Swiss-Prot record:
This is Unconventional myosin-Id. The gene is MYO1D. Residues 9-695 form the Myosin motor domain. Residues 699-719, 721-741 form the IQ domain. One of its GO terms (cellular component) is neuronal cell body. Residues 812-1005 form the TH1 domain. GO terms for molecular function: actin filament binding; ATP binding; calcium-dependent protein binding; calmodulin binding; microfilament motor activity. Unconventional myosin that functions as actin-based motor protein with ATPase activity. Plays a role in endosomal protein trafficking, and especially in the transfer of cargo proteins from early to recycling endosomes. Required for normal planar cell polarity in ciliated tracheal cells, for normal rotational polarity of cilia, and for coordinated, unidirectional ciliary movement in the trachea. Required for normal, polarized cilia organization in brain ependymal epithelial cells. The keyword Protease does not apply. One of its GO terms (biological process) is endocytosis. It is found in: Cytoplasm; Perikaryon; Cell projection, Dendrite; Early endosome. It comes from Bos taurus (Bovine).
Length: 1006
C-alpha cells in the first residue's frame, strides 16, 4: 500500500505544486529542509539537499520499506531512485545509470555511497558466497578511493578531487557479479600545494596519524604534520574525519578487496617518499645546483627501492639526446624544484591509477558466458566533482566546470530537449517550454580549432618559450566576440579581472574567473624521462609496473603525448556517450549554505542552484509531458498477456490498433496518447498498474507453462523409463539364456561322470543372477545327492540320514563324530559289545516292546551316571521311538526310570572327545551320563546318539535343541548346576566328582 507524507512536510513531488513558479518551488524546498525531509521528487528525478548532519533514514528497516516498491508508493528517497533503476534494469534487461550532479559540497559522494549500499542490500537473496564477496569488495572500494582521492576543501571536508564512474554488472537474476571503475582527472597539484584552509589528500594524514610507531620508523616518518612541507598548510586544520581511525578502516578494506601485504606496504612507501621529496631543498654553489640534505636522498632511494646516486642524478640533471649523442644537462635551482614537484605529483597520480586498476582487476566479471548465464546488464553510478568557484580558480577548476557543463548538456538533451522534440516528431500536441541550452558554453570550451582547449593545445605546441600570458592573448584574439567569454583587455572597466592573468567564462552555474597562471605547465604535464627510467629500474615490482614507459631507450624518439586537457575532453565525451546509451536516473544535489550548517537555508544560494540546474524547467516539462513512452511493438511484447484480445497473438491490422485495444481493455485510454510509432503514458501510476497486472498474469502463465512442461517431462520420463525397463528385461533375458546355455554346455553328460560333475567349474553369472545361481547350484547339489543316494542300499539309509543329521548339528563343534564306522545303534543287544549280558537284555527289550508298543530301537549303550546326591553308578540307556529308559545292568537291566521322548527338550554335549551327554527334560530333572563302550574301548558314540535322536524328531516334525558347550549347563530337580570336563593322565575310566558349582567329569588322557 502506498504511503504518503503529511501535508505539513510540503509537496513530496514538485510536479504536484499548485503553480509552477520559483517562489513556490523555493518555499516547498525550504519547508522540507526545515522539516528534515531532504529528498523531493520531480517525477523520476530526486532533488537532494545536503543536511550537514547524520539522519537515521538509511538503515535496514528503511531499505526493506523501499525494496521492490514503485516510486509513488513511498516518500522521496535515494533508495526509491536506486530501486527504480534496479527494477528497470532487471525488468527490461536494459542498462541504466544514476547521474549524481551538483556543486562541490552538495552531498554527491554520500549519495553515491547510499545508492551502492542499497543495491548491495537488496541483491543476492540466496546468499551465494561469490556474490557476497563481490558486493563486499564493491562497497569496500569506496573508502579506499576516498582515502587516496578525496581531500578537505573550504566547502567540503570530504571533497572528491577526482571523477568516478562505476559500472556494476549483474547476471540475469539481478545479482552483482562484478564491476569496473573509471576515474577522471585527479587533482594531483593538491599533492604539492593547497589553498589556505584546505588539506592535501586524506591518505597522507591517515598514514601519519594512524600508522604505528614501528611503521613510521620504517618509513622514516614522524607524526608531526607540520614537519612536512607539502602538507604543513593544512596541518592545524580541524576536520570532521578521524584520520587515525580511518587509517585502520582503509587498511582493512584493502585487505578485504584483495591487495597483497607487499602492495599495501608499497603504497605507504610511496606516500612517505612524497613527503620526504617535499622536504628536499636545493642550494647553488657557484654554477652547481646541490641537494641540501643528502640523507633525505638516501631515504627516498630506500623507499622507492632504487639507488641513491640514481635518485640524486634524476633530481639534479636532465638527460638530453641529440641524435646519437647523449648529454646530461644540469638543472638550475628553479628547474630542480620544478622537477621535484612534478615527480611527486606523477608518483601520486600513478599510485592512484594503480589502485583503481587493481580494484578493477579484482572486481572484474569472471567466467561469465552469455550463452550459459544470459545477458549481463549494468547499473552505472556517476559521482564526479561538482561545479567549483574558488577565490583562485586554475586549470583544475576549468576542467571540473567543463565536466559539469557536459553533464548539464546531457541532462538538457535527454530531459528537456529530446523529450520535447520527440513529442513534436510523434505528433503529440505540445506547447514548447523554453530553457537555457548550454551547448554554446560546451562549444566554447571543446570546439575543434576554436575552443579554449584547442587554443591551449596550440599554445603548448608552439616552438620556443610560451607563457601563460601569451595563451591569454590568444584567447582574447580568437574569442573576443564570444558572449560567454571576457577578460580585462576585452572589458577594461571590469576591475575584478587582472590584466594578463584572468579571464571569465559565463557558465550555466554562474560566472567564474580563471587565472591563467599554470595553465600551460599543467596542460603539458611535463615529467622528465629521467624520472620514468628511475622508477622503471626500481627493484620493487609493484613500482616498476607503474612506469612501463621507463623501459624506452634514451635515444628513442617518441610521439608527443596528448595534453592533459585533450585527454580529459576525450574522456568526458566518452563518458557522456556511455551515459547516453543507458536509461538515466538523476539525483540533483543542492548545497543549502556555505557554512556547512544543518540549520541555515540560504534562499539566494539555493535559488541560484535551482536556476542553473534547470529544475523549474524540469518540473514544467514533467507536468506537461508523459512519464513513459515505448514503441508499439515493445509495449505489446511486454504487456500483451494482460488482454485476451492480444494474447498470445493479435489479429488486428497493426500493433498500434492492438495497443489501443489493450489500453481500452484496462481502462487507461484517458491517460495515454498515441504517437506515430510510440505510445505515451502520462502518469507513472498507470505504468505501475500495468506492471502489476502483468505480474499477476505471469503467475498464471508460469503455472500453465509449468503444468504443461511438467506433464511433458513426466510423459518423456515415463517413455524413457518404459524403454529402459524393456531394454533391461530383454537384456536380462538374454543374459539368463546365455548363462543357462553355458551351464548346460559345461554340465552336458555329467550323468556318465564318476563324480556326477562335482569337478565342473560353474560359469560366472551376471550380478543380477547371483541369487539364481545359488538356487541352481542347490538344485544341482540335490540332484547329485540323489544320484549318490541311489547307490546306497535301502537298509543303510536310516544310518545315512542319522549321520547327516549329526553333521548338521555338530560339524565344526566336535572333532570325532564316529562317521567312519557303521552305527549299530542297539549296542546292548550286540554280543561284541556286551558278550555276558546281551542275552539278558534282549528279553527285557522284548517285554518293553510288548508293554510300551514301541516300533524301533534308536540307541542303547552302557553309561556312567551321576545323580543329584553325587552318587556315580554304572547304568545303561535304552532309547526307542517312544521312550528313554534308564536301566541297571547289574540287576538284569531292570528299568530304573522311564522318560517319554515328548518330555525331552534337548541335549547338551561338550566340545571335546569325551562322551558326556545331558538329556534335558521339561520337568527340569535332567539325566547326566557318560557313554562308554567295552569293545572296542573309547569308541565315540555321541555323534550317533545325537544323529538318531535329531533324525527321529525331524521325522515327527519336531525340533530337538542340541547344545555344544563346556562346561555344560543342567538342572537336577530344579537346581541349576554345571558339568565340566577335565582330562587326567592316570584316569583309568571316566568318572564324576562333586565340586562347588556341580560336577567334574574326569576322562582318561592320551
Amino acid at each position: 500500500m502506498a504511503e504518503q507524507e503529511s501535508l505539513e512536510f510540503g509537496k513530496a513531488d514538485f510536479v504536484l505544486m499548485d503553480t509552477v513558479s520559483m517562489p513556490e518551488f523555493m518555499a516547498n524546498l525550504r519547508l522540507r529542509f526545515e522539516k528534515g525531509r531532504i529528498y523531493t521528487f520531480i517525477g523520476e528525478v530526486v532533488v537532494s539537499v545536503n543536511p550537514y548532519k547524520s539522519l537515521n533514514i538509511y538503515g535496514r528497516d528503511t531499505i526493506e520499506q523501499y525494496k521492490g516498491r514503485e516510486l509513488y508508493e513511498r516518500p522521496p528517497h535515494l533508495f526509491a531512485i536506486a530501486d527504480a533503476a534496479y527494477k528497470a534494469m532487471k525488468r527490461r534487461s536494459k542498462d541504466t545509470c544514476i547521474v549524481i550532479s551538483g556543486e562541490s559540497g552538495a552531498g554527491k559522494t554520500e549519495a553515491s555511497k547510499y545508492i551502492m549500499q542499497y543495491i548491495a542490500a537488496i541483491t543476492n537473496p540466496s546468499q551465494r558466497a561469490e556474490i557476497e564477496r563481490v558486493k563486499n569488495m564493491l562497497l569496500k572500494s569506496n573508502c579506499v578511493l576516498e582515502a587516496f582521492g578525496n581531500a578537505k576543501t573550504n566547502r567540503n571536508d570530504n571533497s572528491s578531487r577526482f571523477g568516478k564512474y562505476m559500472d556494476i554488472n549483474f547476471d540475469f537474476k539481478g545479482d552483482p557479479i562484478g564491476g569496473h571503475i573509471n576515474n577522471y582527472l585527479l587533482e594531483k597539484s593538491r599533492v604539492i600545494v593547497q589553498q589556505p584552509g584546505e588539506r592535501s589528500f586524506h591518505s597522507f594524514y591517515q598514514l601519519l596519524q594512524g600508522g604505528s610507531d614501528q611503521m613510521l620508523r620504517s618509513l622514516h616518518l614522524q607524526k608531526s604534520l607540520s614537519s612536512y612541507s607539502y602538507i604543513h598548510v593544512g596541518a592545524q586544520l580541524k576536520s570532521s574525519i578521524n584520520d587515525a581511525a580511518e587509517f585502520k578502516v582503509v587498511a582493512d578494506a584493502m585487505k578485504v578487496i584483495g591487495f597483497k601485504p607487499e602492495e599495501i606496504q608499497t603504497a605507504y612507501k610511496i606516500l612517505a617518499a612524497i613527503l620526504h621529496l617535499g622536504n628536499l631543498k636545493f642550494v647553488v654553489d657557484g654554477d652547481t645546483t646541490l641537494i641540501e640534505d643528502g640523507k633525505l636522498v638516501s631515504i627516498i632511494a630506500e623507499l622507492l627501492s632504487t639507488k641513491t646516486d640514481m635518485v640524486e642524478k634524476a633530481l639534479l640533471y636532465r638527460t638530453v639526446a641529440t641524435g646519437r649523442d647523449v648529454i646530461d644537462k644540469q638543472h638550475t635551482e628553479q628547474e630542480a624544484s620544478y622537477g621535484r614537484d612534478a615527480f611527486a605529483k606523477a608518483i601520486y597520480e600513478r599510485l592512484f591509477c594503480w589502485i583503481v586498476s587493481r580494484i578493477n582487476d579484482i572486481i572484474a566479471v569472471k567466467n561469465s558466458d552469455t550463452t550459459i548465464h544470459g545477458k549481463n546488464t549494468v547499473i552505472g553510478v556517476l559521482d564526479i566533482y561538482g561545479f567549483e568557484i574558488f577565490d583562485n580558480n586554475s586549470f583544475e577548476q576549468f576542467c571540473i566546470n567543463y565536466c559539469n557543463e557536459k553533464l548539464q548538456q546531457l541532462f538538457i538533451q535527454l530531459v528537456l530537449k529530446q523529450e520535447q522534440e520527440e513529442y513534436q516528431r510523434e505528433g503529440i500536441p505540445w506547447k514548447h517550454i523554453d530553457y537555457f541550452n548550454n551547448q554554446i558554453i560546451v562549444d566554447l570550451v571543446e570546439q575543434q580549432h576554436k575552443g579554449i582547449i584547442a587554443i591551449l593545445d596550440d599554445a603548448c605546441m608552439n616552438v620556443g618559450k610560451v607563457t601563460d600570458e601569451m595563451f591569454l592573448e590568444a584567447l582574447n584574439s580568437k574569442l573576443g566576440k564570444h558572449g560567454h567569454f571576457s577578460s580585462r583587455k576585452l572589458c577594461a572597466s571590469d576591475k575584478i579581472l587582472e590584466f594578463d592573468r584572468d579571464f571569465r567564462i559565463r557558465h550555466y552555474a554562474g560566472d567564474v574567473v580563471y587565472s591563467v597562471v599554470g595553465f600551460i605547465d599543467k596542460n603539458k604535464d611535463t615529467l622528465f624521462q629521467d624520472f620514468k627510467r628511475l622508477m622503471y629500474n626500481s627493484s620493487n615490482p609493484v613500482l616498476k609496473n607503474m612506469w612501463p614507459e621507463g623501459k624506452l631507450s634514451i635515444t628513442e624518439v617518441t610521439r608527443r603525448p596528448l595534453t592533459a586537457a585533450t585527454l580529459f575532453k576525450n574522456s568526458m565525451i566518452a563518458l557522456v556517450d556511455n551515459l547516453a546509451s543507458k536509461e538515466p536516473y538523476y539525483v540533483r544535489c543542492i548545497k543549502p549554505n556555505d557554512m556547512k550548517s544543518p540549520q541555515i537555508f540560504d534562499d539566494e544560494r539555493c535559488r541560484h542552484q535551482v536556476e542553473y540546474l534547470g529544475l523549474l524547467e524540469n518540473v514544467r516539462v514533467r507536468r506537461a509531458g508523459f512519464a513513459f513512452r515505448q514503441t508499439y511493438e515493445k509495449f505489446l511484447h511486454r504487456y500483451k498477456m494482460i488482454s485476451e484480445f492480444t494474447w498470445p497473438n493479435h489479429d488486428l491490422p497493426s500493433d498500434k490498433e492492438a495497443v489501443k485495444k489493450l489500453v481500452e481493455y484496462c481502462g487507461f485510454q484517458d491517460d495515454v496518447a498515441y504517437g506515430k510509432t510510440k505510445i505515451f503514458i502520462r502518469t507513472p501510476r498507470t505504468l505501475f498498474t500495468l506492471e502489476e497486472l502483468r505480474a499477476q498474469m505471469l503467475v498464471r502463465i508460469v503455472l500453465f507453462l509449468q503444468k504443461v512442461w511438467r506433464g511433458t517431462l513426466a510423459r518423456m520420463r515415463y517413455k524413457r523409463t518404459k524403454a529402459a525397463l524393456t531394454i533391461i528385461r530383454y537384456y536380462r533375458r538374454y543374459k539368463v539364456k546365455s548363462y543357462i546355455h553355458e551351464v548346460a554346455r559345461r554340465f552336458h553328460g555329467i550323468k556318465t561322470m564318476r563324480d556326477y560333475g562335482k569337478h565342473v567349474q560353474w560359469p560366472t553369472p551376471p550380478k543380477v543372477l547371483h541369487r539364481f545361481e545359488e538356487v541352481l547350484q542347490a538344485v544341482f547339489n540335490r540332484w547329485r545327492a540323489s544320484q549318490l543316494i541311489k547307490t546306497i542300499p535301502a537298509s543303510d539309509l536310516p544310518q545315512v540320514r542319522a549321520k547327516v543329521a549329526a553333521v548338521e548339528m555338530l560339524k565344526g563343534q566336535r572333532a570325532d563324530l564316529g562317521l567312519q564306522r557303521a552305527w549299530e545303534g542297539n549296542y546292548l543287544a550286540s554280543k561284541p559289545d556286551t558278550p555276558q549280558t546281551s542275552g539278558t537284555f534282549v528279553p527285557v527289550a522284548n517285554e518293553l516292546k510288548r508293554k510300551d508298543k514301541y516300533m524301533n530301537v534308536l540307541f542303547s549303550c552302557h553309561v556312567r551316571k551321576v545323580n543329584r546326591f553325587s552318587k556315580v553308578e554304572d547304568r545303561a540307556i535304552f532309547v526307542t521311538d517312544r521312550h528313554l529308559y534308564k536301566m541297571d545292568p547289574t540287576k538284569q537291566y531292570k528299568v530304573m526310570k522311564t522318560i517319554p521322548l515328548y518330555n525331552l527338550t534337548g541335549l547338551s554335549v561338550s566340545n571335546g572327545k569325551d562322551q558326556l551327554v545331558v538329556f534335558h527334560t521339561k520337568d527340569n530333572k535332567d539325566l547326566i551320563v557318560c557313554l562308554f563302550s567295552k569293545q572296542p574301548t573309547h569308541e565315540s558314540r555321541i555323534g550317533e546318539l545325537v544323529g538318531v535322536l535329531v533324525n527321529h524328531f525331524k521325522s515327527e516334525k519336531r525340533h530337538l535343541q542340541v547344545n555344544v558347550t563346556n562346561p555344560v549347563q543342567c538342572s537336577l530337580h530344579g537346581k541349576k548346576c554345571t558339568v565340566s570336563v577335565e582330562t587326567r593322565l592316570n584316569q583309568p575310566q571316566p568318572d564324576f566328582t562333586k565340586n562347588r558349582s556341580g560336577f567334574i567329569l574326569s576322562v582318561p588322557g592320551n
